[in-house]
Amino acid sequence: VVPAYYINLDRARERRDFMERQAERLGLRLSRFSALSAEDVDETRFTALAGLWERPMTRVEVAVLLSHASLWQKVADDDAPLAIFEDDAVLSPRLPEFLREPLPAYDLINLEYFARRKFFRRYASDGRMSDIARDKAGAAAYLLSPDGARKALAAIENHAAPADAFLYASGRLEMTQVEPALAVQAEVLSAKGIDPGVATVTQIHEPRGRLAPTSDNWVYGWRRTLTQLRLVPLHVGRGTFYEFREPRVDLSEFAPDQSSS
């Protein structure tokens, strides 16, 4: 069985209880990882990482990235795959069975439905998993292999980004998507009119102002432009080599957490 961890701030007791209730209901052994808070990120580390993406990262975003990276280090050290969840992931009843099955050879297996389209490779699906050419968003539920962990850790010092953007940077990891998806973030369910059973406001939701068009900020615009240029071949290949669509999901699986009532 692939071990499973969820990332949770010490002060986020409601989220912890939510994940523990799900684990009990599903018969899933789910361990807690104490997340780094913004206050845990020292100034030196923040300064080294915050300016490496397409806009300046917030201290909260750096803390979330480093929390994920701590579990990537565990994967690399143990030389064994790990399923990693954020504490607002609503889990499918099919998840425990999936974690007991033999794993295909990918760096990352995305377990999540995030309600955004992504690029899938055409003709690269076995009906249960579909190969991803380029993902976009969501790091609430994924399975990482030791090779994937080592690749991610090797890149973090020079290419830091918010956790999902970092994981899904073009060409970094070989990825596939479980279909139908095995997890959905609470805020995604809420947006679709489904009660997720937990509050949907997270520590990531802090205001960010627009980036001023100054000489100091040109590098961020340049990085965004490079990202868009990398997408051009994918868009050109749509319909021939790639499909641009949302992952398949059965939202009826993700009922409210009845054990809280």
Regions from the language model: what does each represent?
Residues 1-85, 89-261:
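An acidic/histidine-cluster motif and surrounding catalytic segment
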